[in-house]
Design a protein with these regions (language model features):
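Flexible, membrane-associating and regulatory peripheral segments of lipid-active enzymes
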Residues: 2-120, 127-137, 147-155, 159, ...
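Conserved hydrolase catalytic core segment
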Residues: 179-186
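Short, well-ordered amphipathic alpha-helical segments that serve as non-catalytic structural scaffolds
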Residues: 144-149, 215
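Alpha/beta-hydrolase active-site loop signature
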Residues: 125-127, 195
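Glycine-rich nucleophile elbow surrounding the catalytic serine of serine-hydrolase chemistry
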Residues: 91, 164-177
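Alpha/beta-hydrolase fold nucleophile elbow
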Residues: 156-168, 188
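The feature captures the conserved acid-bearing segment of alpha/beta-hydrolase catalytic domains
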Residues: 186, 192-246
Length: 460
């Protein structure tokens, strides 16, 4: 070839290479040209199951790739990265047939914590309007999710790297999938697992500890839509598992119906977004916890205080997961929800022939929290657990009020004002092994219905 013919072609080739980086890494998949989102459904859309798998990765954290699970190598041609852990999000029953408002916040919260594959299982078509039909679809859905996970494993993912996060009915779908894998998946998190049709179901039909190497569940609506029985290695009962603070009154009917139930989801999102720990305390019941009978991270079933979130096994050593454990914690009305817990105690100098009720309030830099404790008849000690939004050392003041006794007052008889004398002590949880509490330096005299204010100066 003559030099004058070669030069223009070489120049053209160089320009082409500059403008078109020929297959810039053959295995690299760019941001999808089309972003897929949830299907929409309605009460008139029927109950036929139609499942979409939406993939989000560090390469496309805001843009869902629709994976056709029936197409050979569809996952392999996507942005899926088998070297990363995989979070599989499964929603539950839908009344309206629209995308859950919590879906995007949960996806983004996961990406802020770690590089991960996020797969959203959209079964809006098949979960809308008719709850019983949605329940009937669970086994079929579980089989499809199982087949999808097997494709991930074929690409090199490990069973232990799979974490299913299921909300309401989605928690039991996760249980069905985990059962198909013989409990070898890494983790299943149930966000207020659904109650109806599952409370009396067999372990194979619902979420249970045998479904994964670690199963945790968050209970927030156990007196309504959420299941009350423990279903995991660790079960968190938030504010006793029902009646969440900040949820609206029955006047706002729809929000009233779903607020407690969805609080588990928003608590989980908050645990990923905020550093303050949502720590649970092992105890036999919420009543025993609030009464101040479970002050440390030790019980017959558990020797740790697990935390909601992505911490491995909730921070619990593997050897402690041989039996199911229930843990309890209180929260605030809004994100980040986390509170500090302290035990408060009043010790009477002299026992009384009637029960004694004392309101104890903490005043911090901004907010105020209070509880009422009871000293039983002929007893001398009353205690309880009080939640507060700042550490105990930042609580400036304690206010104690002796509550009035109920009595019938005769018109011809004078009424004597009641008074007691005793000692006030407190300690932030978990309590120290020494059992030593901080006590005010002097005894207090409380007069009925008269608030007594005292500075509270504990060390940070």
């Amino acid at each position: 070839m003559a030099a004058r013919e070669w030069a223009p072609r070489a120049l053209a080739a160089a320009v082409f290479l500059l403008l078109c980086p020929a297959r810039a890494a053959e295995d690299e998949v760019l941001e999808p040209s089309i972003c897929f989102d949830f299907q929409s459904s309605s009460i008139f859309g029927g109950t036929k199951l139609n499942v979409h798998f939406l993939l989000y990765t560090p390469k496309n954290p805001d843009c869902g790739q629709l994976i056709d699970a029936n197409t050979t190598d569809a996952v392999g041609k996507s942005n899926f990265n088998a070297t990363l852990d995989t979070k599989i999000i499964i929603h539950g029953f839908s009344v309206m047939g629209t995308k859950p408002s919590w879906a995007d916040p949960l996806i983004q919260a996961l990406f802020r914590v770690m590089d991960v594959n996020v797969v959203v299982v959209d079964w809006m078509s098949g979960s809308t309007a008719k709850y019983i039909s949605a329940v009937d679809n669970i086994t079929s859905l579980g089989l499809q999710v199982t087949a999808f996970i097997r494709q991930l494993l074929a690409l090199g993912s490990r069973e232990s790297s799979i974490h299913i996060i299921g909300a309401s009915l989605g928690a039991h779908v996760g249980g069905v999938v985990g059962n198909f894998f013989g409990g070898k998946l890494g983790r299943i998190t149930g966000l207020d697992p659904a109650a109806y049709k599952f409370t009396k179901a067999s372990a194979e039909e619902r979420l249970d500890p045998g479904d994964a190497l670690f199963v945790d569940a968050i209970h927030t609506d156990a007196d309504n839509f959420g299941i009350q029985i423990p279903v995991g290695h660790i079960d968190y009962y938030i504010n006793g598992g029902k009646d969440q603070p900040g949820c609206p009154s029955p006047r706002d009917f729809y929000k009233y119906l779903i607020c407690d139930h969805t609080r588990a989801i928003y608590l989980y999102i908050s645990s990923l977004e905020h550093p303050c720990p949502l720590m649970g305390f092992p105890c036999s019941s919420y009543q025993n916890f609030t009464a101040g009978n479970c002050l440390d991270c030790s019980s017959d079933l558990l020797q740790s205080c697990p935390r909601i979130g992505l911490l491995e096994r909730g921070g619990v050593p593997k050897e402690e997961l041989s039996r199911q454990a229930q843990v309890f914690l209180m929260t605030t009305t809004a994100a980040p929800y986390c509170v500090h817990h302290s035990v408060v105690e009043f010790q009477l100098l002299h026992p009384r022939s009637t029960s004694t009720y004392i309101e104890i309030a903490f005043r911090g830099e901004v907010n105020r929290s209070f509880i009422q404790i009871k000293i039983p008849k002929h007893g001398q000690v009353g205690r309880g657990v009080i939640p507060h939004d700042v550490p105990l050392c930042r609580i400036h003041t304690v206010v104690l009020t002796l509550q009035a006794r109920s009595r019938i007052i005769s018109l011809w008889r004078s009424v004597n004002t009641d008074a007691i004398e005793g000692r006030f002590c407190t300690e932030q949880l978990p309590a120290q092994a020494s059992g030593k509490m901080f006590c005010l330096s002097q005894n207090l005299t409380l007069t009925e219905n008269l608030p007594y204010t005292h500075d509270l100066a504990t060390a940070c």
